[in-house]
Structures are given as C-alpha cells and as structure tokens.
C-alpha cells in the first residue's frame, strides 16, 4: 500500500514538473532567442558564409556581424565558448536564427529521453525517480530558455560513465574528449582514467581530443584557436573571462575577487586589497576539494556502483570550483545527484537522501540574494557555493577508502607541485596588474566597458557597452553623456577630424554618419586624413575587411589582406594593422594599391600616429597579452611602454604628442576595458 502511494506521488510530481517544462518553459524559449543561443549560432553562421572568424572573440567585432545579420539580441559575445562547441550549429546555421533555435530546442528535448534511460542504468534509480530529479532541476529550465549546451553535455557525460561501467574504455575515452571539446571543465574526469590506470580510455580520450582540435582548426583556422588558448582560456581559469566580481555566479573565484581585489568601478570597497591572498587561496581551496576526490579513487577495477560514486565526487568537486558558473551549468548536476541518490536508496539511508535532495534543490534555487555588497558581507551572498561544498562533502564521504601509502605520497607530491606552480603563476600574473588604476577615467556604473577613446577638445569620445547595446559616449572631467541615438542601432566606432565627428551606426549594414554632411554606406572603422576633409574606412568584401580612402580601394580580397585598424599621420601617410591569409596581425605602411610595407615591430595592432608625426604608438602581443609600445619614426627605435598581464590597447594621442589615452582591461574581465589617460613622454 505504501509503495503504491509513493509511486502515485512520484507520478503526480513528474506530471506537474513535465507540465511546467512543456507548458511554461518551452513556450517562452520558443518565442525569443534570449542570451546564449545566438553566440553559438552566429559563430557557425560566419564560417558557413565564408567570413574570416579570427576576431570572433572581440566583443565589438562580433556585435557588428550580429547586427549585419539582423539577429534579435541586444548583445552577443563568444567569450568563454570553445570554437568546437559551435560546430554542432553548422547544420542549422543556414536557417533564420529563431527557426534554428526551434530546431535546437527540439533536439535537446529529444535528448532527455535517452539521457533518462542511461541515467537509470548508471544510478540504479527507476525511470520515474530519474524523471523527477530531471524535472526538479531548475537549471534545466534555464538551459532551455537560453538555448544552452548543457543538456548535450549531460548526455555525453552520462554515456561516458555508462561506457566506463561496462569497460567499453575506448568509447568512454572518446565521449569524454567530446565533453572536454564542448566545455573544458570535464577534463578533470580524465584523472579518473589515470588513477585507474585505464590507459585504453586515456589514449582514446587523447586521440579523439586531437581529432576534435583538427576538425575545429580546419573550420575556424588557427588564429581563433590561438586566441582561445593564449587569452580566453587563461582568463577563464582565473575567473576573469566575464565580470570577476559578480557574486551572481556564487563561485569561489568571484567571492575571493570580491573580498581581496580592488577595482575602481567594479569593486571599489573590497574587504581588503590583498591580491596575493587570491593567488594563494584560490588554488589552495580548489585543491582542498579536488585532492580527496582523487585520493579516494580505488586504483583497481571497481564495481559499477563504486565507479559511479567516484565519478560523481570528481564531477561535483569540479563543478564546485568552476570559476564563473551560470545557473544553467548545473544541469550537469543531475548526473552526480542521481548516482548518490541511487546509492542511498539501495542502502536505505533516508536521512542522507533527504539532505542530498535538499542540497540539490538549494543549488538550483533561483531566488538567492546575490546582489553586490561590499567587504566581508560578500560571504553572505554565495549560498549556492556553500550548498555545492556540502554536496561534494557528502559525495566524498561515500567514496572514502584506504589507498596505499606509496600512492598517496606520489599524489601528494603531484598536488604540491601543481599548487606551487599555480601560486607562482598567479603572483607573476599580478605583477604590475594594477599600475594603471591611478590613470583611469571615471565610468558610469551603467557602462560595462568603454573602448576606442578619441580626444575632442577637452572631452573624450568613446564607445560604451550598455545593457541595450553599444553607444557613443562623451566623457568629461566629472560627467558621462550618452549619445541621443534612437537606441535601436549600435554605434561601434568613431573618429574626429577637424570640427567633424564621424560615428559608425550599425544595423543591417554599417553606415558612417557625420555630425554634419553626407553619410557613407557600407563603411566601418573610420579614420580621418589631415584636416578631416577626407575619410579612410574599412568595408567588408568576401568576408574580409578592405581599406578605402575616399572613393579609392587600396586593398583587394584576392591579395589575402584582412584589415583591422587604420591610423593616419599629419602628412596623410597611412599605417594599418592587417593580417594576410589568416596569419598574425602586423603593422604596415600603405604605399599603393595592395602595396603594404611591413613595419618590423613583431605581432602588433592598434596603430596611432602622434599629432607631431614623430611617434607611432601601438600594442604588441607577447605572453598572451597586448601591451603598449612606442616607435620613433626618426631613429626607428622601439620600446615597450608596459609589460603587464592584461590588455592595454587602442592608444590615441592627445594634442601634446606626449600623453596617450588607451583602453585597459587590467583588473577587469577579458576585453571589458576602461579608459586610461597617461603621459609616457617627458
């Protein structure tokens, strides 16, 4: 009798949860694109259309491409997405955006059925019980609303565990490699293969990972992957791919950033400014969770139940210290929780089972107060982090076992080495990181980033990212004013010449509008010649940006050039940053049509010629960062102005030819720059 009532209650709950998904979440997801799906879709569509995607991690560059395709989403960005993860959108990238999302939603909904079936097998729960756990996962609803990837990842990881339990090691390794290619964090699960000496699975993982990399590079090119490996991935691991001080992520990284790192706009009142504490505590606390999960993995073949528990502990530890998780990340939490619940049901341990379910609901609960607060009060605003830590502790308690002392010594030695390297690397990264804080110009709190500074009289014109898109912004001594544009079209670049202000207004096409005078159609990234009477600009032809001065085209697509930025000297000589055949960006002097003469300063972008014509400021790329450099046109001497572990780009000279404006993301998220004003010459 009790069993029938219990099953009836489960059926009722599943019916209610299914109605919520099908009757509320899916209709909302069906009507609009929402935040994340356009990012994946756009990347796949660009390469499908033959556009060079090398700059896809540049926020403003990608926004322009989004606008040109009439994608109804205020802001897009590819950071911190892996290029490979967008490849699955290739078959549907030829569809209109909302139709493509419909296809994606149908695929995700269909995947839930085999996922539930496989999860029943790996966890020991009934189909009904697994269905209830899936329905109780609020992050799953967010995954559907935003068109995210985590249902696919959940399916991959569940299938990989199913294969491990049945000793189908090559299949398990290959599936895990797919999971890593989609979202980096499952790479920690490969340590399970190492601890078990499951070399077949590890080799399959490495080979499949290599094949995924080859496939991705063949589609997107090496340049985009180089940017990901050298810039995006390191920032992601530090928790700085997006706003690192935002407590809504409820991560260890965001908590420690909030407590110990000062930033003038984003975190003006930390508990104390002690970045060295972040460099030490972040890896140390991560290791505190990860090391037991590794140490207590048995080094011999285990039962299917034991293997599943080991995976759940390792996956939970990984999810707990993921740097900047959004709510939908925890769709993957269904797998480890199902495994733990299945084990506790079999052991008839009701109290721990109730605790696990309560913690599972707490992790997914959308109503936690994560508002920004100052100082030590930040500890009160990361409740999801505490629920994850407790859930991981439960999983660790279930796998605790006695490992041989010799093996423990080796693992401890490896952990100590990894911790030392991480701390030293973190401290090195912080060297000089905050040096340009005294030179920062005040930003409005509504500005997520400010870029492309241009002096105009006593004020500075810049492009700012606001909640509804990009707007030209005027920054005075104590004031910030936004352009009175219609609010529909983005404003993505600008220049000043004489009394004129030229702004690139972007909709289905880019139009350079003058403060007075005619506009220029299909033109972007303007730069004025001396006197401001003639304009140089870029125009996209066959997926690459080409240089125009007035009505004359100075580069052609057949030559392989793809231009990024333009600078013009007082005597009207032109210096550009450009790539050829998807190579590294270099600086060139334009001598004629398709005649670009290399300036030998290494990999460089963002040229800016001083008003007196003596100096060329630019950014050079070294050790994964863009830093400022200076070249004397007379002596040809080149010197580095800055050497820091962040990006300082888009220099612009003041009229004294000694002071630079530039964009800096030091102490901020990758590419989310602020404006600095700094004198470099005596």
Protein language model regions, located:
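Transmembrane alpha-helices and membrane-interface helical segments
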Residues: 114-118, 155-166, 192-197, 201, ...
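A cytosolic-side transmembrane-helix exit/cap motif
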Residues: 150-153, 173-176, 223-230, 333, ...
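Transmembrane helices and adjacent periplasmic/lumenal helix-loop junctions
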Residues: 174-193, 321-332
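Primarily membrane-embedded glycan-assembly and transfer machineries that use lipid-linked glycans
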Residues: 1-171, 196-327
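Membrane-embedded alpha-helical segments of multi-pass membrane proteins
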Residues: 106-111, 151-156, 179-185, 206, ...
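Aromatic-enriched
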Residues: 339-430
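Sequence signature of WD/YWTD-type beta-propeller architectures
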Residues: 408-682
